[in-house]
Structures are given as structure tokens and as C-alpha cells.
């Protein structure tokens, strides 16, 4: 006995609706699967980026700590005999452990040590927590960038032509004045952090360098010794040294503005 055409029509309608529902559910399911896959890909990308960022921060930290730590050990244990000391510069020191304390005190009188130590501390903190972003930390991080770049430039222009490092100092000198400055700037260019520079920050980053200069010249006035020849007010006078410092500040501010400009450009391309 055949089915009534009306029944067949109703059945076909139900089947059609059922198939449409299945197709709709399948489409929705496929969309959910696609979104899950996209989220997974994005998550893996972020995880890999964090890993790569930490690797770069880690290498930067190793370089900075090696340079600073090497100098600290060399000076503590007097591993490199002290050569002839120029008038009004740090030294001479007693040989061996008897002169360890004065050597370490003088060691912390160098801008190179301040900049490398600041890089070592800030980059290690970024390695431990790449998302660290307090305003104070941003200031320290950006200051370390400017100071380490100035360290490399000033050493190359004003000190390297007459410098003659020996023994272990050859390696610590290369690390602190060439390798760490280059790595630090390169890592910043590659992975930031971004959007940390502002016009106000280009002024704030001079707080620590200025504190260093105040300490250096106050101490120098007491002991008649300075870390660098171009700081020697006894030999060259305050006007000449002051002029040099003004030129250094101007050059430093130009570099700070360059960091600001690069930060804005790299933030847009991120």
C-alpha cells in the first residue's frame, strides 16, 4: 500500500530540515574547530616568542655579568699587574690582597662599571619576567640602554686610541666596551620591550649618569684622582672638562631622541 503524497511531502520536509540542521551544526562545529586551531597556533606563537625573547635576554645578561664579574675578580685578586699610572688617574694600588679594597672602590668609580652593572641587573630581571613593566623599571631599563651605548661610543672615541689592555683585561675590556653594548642595543631592536620611551623619558634617563658625575667630581676633589683623563680638572681645568661634558650630554640627548624615534617606528611595525 503506497503512502499518501501529503505524507511523503511532510516526510521530505522533515528530512530536509534535519539535513539542514546537521549541515548547520557541522558548519558551526567546523567554525569552532577552526577557531580552536587558530587560538592554539596563536598561543604556540606567543610561547615560542617568549622563549626566543628569554633566550636573547639570557645571552645579553650573560655577556653583561661576564664583563662585570670578570673585572671584579681581576681587581679583587690582582690577577693583572698594574702598569704605570698616569698622574691624577686612579691608582697606584698596593699589590695583592692588601690593595683589594681600594681597587674595588676605584672599580666602582668607572662609568663603564655602572653601565654594565645596570644592564646586567635590568636584563636579568627581564629574563626572569619578560612582562615586567613598572614605570621605575622602564626608567632603569631605558637608562641602561643609553648608558651602555654611551660607554661603547666614548670608549671607542676617547680611550681606545691610547688604551693597551693586557692579559685578562683584554677579555673584560672587549666584553664591557664592545660586546655587551652591541648585544644590548641589538636585543632591544629585536624584541624591545616597546613603547617605553617618551619625550619625558629622554630627560629622565640622565638622572643616573648625572648622579655618577656628581659622585665622581666630589670624590675627585677629595682624593685628586679621576677615572678618565677627560675628567681630569687638575690637568685641563674646569672650563675644558665642563665643555667636554656639555658635548657628551648633547650627544647623549641626541641618542635618547634616536631611541625614542626608533621605539615609535618599531612599535608601529610590531
Identify what each model region corresponds to.
Residues 13, 18-20, 29:
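Residue-level detector of structural "landmarks"
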Residues 63-84:
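Alpha-helical transmembrane segments of multi-pass membrane proteins
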Residues 129-140, 192-200:
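Membrane-interface helix-boundary motifs at transmembrane edges
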Residues 50-55, 223-259:
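Membrane-interface transmembrane-helix boundary segments in multi-pass integral membrane proteins
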Residues 156-165:
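Juxtamembrane "helix-exit" motif on the non-cytosolic side of transmembrane helices
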Residues 181-197:
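Alpha-helical transmembrane segments in multipass membrane proteins, preferentially the mid-helix core
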